């Protein structure tokens, strides 16, 4: 299936305190209706007042985990994004707290693939994380070692 078609018209809130990240994500998602927020307060107000299919949430600068709680309450798919907090603990926390994916900023250029995986998994009734581990297995093994999933108790499939 064409990635753009699956994402076309989706309303996505992009939250990050770095303007260049907001610009890049908007450029990568022209098929979506994007709204941007640079602060926790701005994102919280948008989530409370508007409808979104999905929110891409920076973990560090904008209190991403607090925003994820709001997303879960509003049934908005939450995707965690980070540059500095790429750790097994944050991946596990994102998974446990109900995020649909965890995207390292250095993999941001593949955002359409990650988002498409989420919608494909949703259509198939599978865990949102089923393809994530396949796509980022090499990246994570290089960064954390070959047994990182087992050591941190991941059970997705």
Describe these PLM feature segments.
Residues 24-29, 46, 70, 93:
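Alpha-helical interaction/dimerization surfaces of two-component signaling modules
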Residues 19-35:
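Two-component/phosphorelay signaling modules centered on CheY-like receiver
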Residues 115-116, 123-157:
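CheY-like receiver
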Residues 66, 73, 85-104, 109-113:
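Alpha4 helix (beta4-alpha4-beta5 surface) of REC/receiver domains from two-component response regulators
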Residues 19, 36-54, 62:
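Acidic, metal-coordinating helix/loop segments flanking the phosphotransfer/catalytic sites
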Residues 10, 14-17:
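Acidic di-acidic motifs
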Residues 5-7, 73:
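Short, flexible coil/linker segments at domain boundaries that flank nucleotide/cofactor-interacting
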Residues 56, 60, 68-71, 75-88:
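A short, hydrophobic beta-strand element within the central beta-sheet of small alpha/beta folds
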């Amino acid at each position: 299936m064409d990635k753009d078609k699956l994402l076309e018209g989706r309303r996505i809130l992009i939250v990050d305190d770095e303007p260049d990240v907001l610009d890049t994500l908007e450029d990568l998602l022209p098929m979506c209706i994007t709204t941007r927020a640079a602060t926790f307060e701005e994102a919280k107000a948008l989530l409370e007042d508007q409808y979104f299919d999905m929110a891409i949430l920076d973990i560090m600068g904008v209190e991403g985990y607090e925003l994820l709680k709001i997303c879960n309450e509003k049934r908005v798919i939450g995707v965690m994004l980070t540059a500095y907090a790429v750790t097994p603990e944050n991946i596990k926390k994102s998974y446990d707290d109900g995020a649909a994916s965890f995207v390292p900023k250095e993999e941001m250029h593949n955002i359409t693939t990650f988002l498409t995986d989420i919608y494909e998994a949703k259509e198939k009734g599978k865990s949102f994380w089923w393809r994530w581990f396949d796509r980022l297995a090499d990246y994570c093994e290089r960064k954390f070692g070959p047994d990182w999933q087992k050591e941190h108790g991941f059970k997705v499939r």
